[in-house]
Amino acid sequence: MLLVLLTLILPPLQGAVETKDYKASLFGIKSNGTTLNTRSIQKAIDFIHDRGGGRLVFDVGRYLTGTIYLKSGVTIHLLEGAVLVGSPNPFDYDTQHNWTALLFALEQENVGITGEGGVIDGQGFTVANNLVDLIHKGLVEDPLRNDRPREAIRPQNIYFWRCTGVRVEDITLKDPASWNQQYDQCREVTIKNLIIDSKSYWNNDGVDIVDCDTVEVANLHIDAADDGICLKSHDKNAVCQNVYIHDNVVRTSANGIKFGTASLGGFKNVRIMNNLVYDTYRSAITMAAVDGGFVEDVVVDGLKSINTGNVIFLRIGERWQPGKKGRMKNISISNVYAEVPEKKADAGYNYEGPWEHQPRNISPSSIVGLPGAPIEDITLKNIEIHHPGGGDPNFARVGLDELDKVPELPSNYPEFSMFKELPAWGFYLRHVKNLTMENIKLVAEKKDYRRAIVIDDVEGARIKGLAVKEPGPKKDPVFIYKSTGVKIEK
């Protein structure tokens, strides 16, 4: 079934052309971990590219380097025990582009980074702190907000821009100084079978897919300080589309799988299947259209979320383009099992998420549009959420007679906790059109003053097979406010 689905969604992916193997040692590339190999590695890549392509193969050892550029037809191949090590010196990285990276590929075809258990180690903590030191000494200019350099001047492990036919497979990517890997306006991209350890510094995303077309993200094991798998749209004239995300395991101190926050263009035709999110501070799945762009035609099927602070967060906003609200429609989320903890889900991990938007009781999943800009055509099916409950009105309270006091916050950064206290513990649904909820099971472990579901300004909703279990006096699980066409069936 998955093979058939992949064939339907993605055309055949063209990988790097592996016509011949070249050992790194033939080019004088040293494996001692102390010799800076930037020039010799680049000469090797240029040599292979000029001769029609092939693989530059690294055997056991530690290969220190600054910025290198992949070229068409060339694959870097890391054998087991081979480690490509980023230089700790910030001046060894190229800063002439919008982003800084250890490995660049710009407007190339059939490029790849593959391996048999090899590693790319960005030494991000050391690089970032050395960069901070240079900024304090006046040798590098940066506003240094919160004593952190901007993301763009800290090296990512991988940055590919406008490339076609990309393969990144069977390696470990660890310790970037910024995002771990970014694929920007690329086509025909395969990212699979990776171990991603991304907890060395702030903004350590696992993988970022930006305005790309035809992408497969599969079998990744991600441990990240920031968003795990993140789709972005930086260009208002571009779309991130035809993306298939499946069979991944994600742990983050932010969101497991996220659309946005940058959402200038849009996201279309995305399939997210059979993924596990655990020990994650924010939401298992977040979709945000807050910068004038759109999200449409998305299917999430098969999501297990364990010890995750929130399950589902869908949000329309109006952040960077005043007067142009985001749009979101045709979203299906099904076959979800989730456990929300009472305590902080990422406690003890490096770079924990901040305990934000207090005071509030433990938040519900939420689908929130804007007045006059509803989120449309939403299906939630076969979803089971175990929530700690315990909402205490003496700690924080929004009563059912105070729903108009819940702020709209169209220009705020979108986060599941952004509204502070909400009047529901299971689902908060506001500014939605055409909603279907089938076979939803909500379990609260403790008595909660809030209703399980609050429906506010919803036009057309069908709820069938709702099961709610919570201790305490029985109350109607659904509260409907300023809504039309809402039907609740057994």
Task: Mark where each language-model region is.
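Sec-dependent signal peptide recognition
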Residues: 1-5
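Extracellular/periplasmic carbohydrate-active domains that bind, remodel
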Residues: 6-490
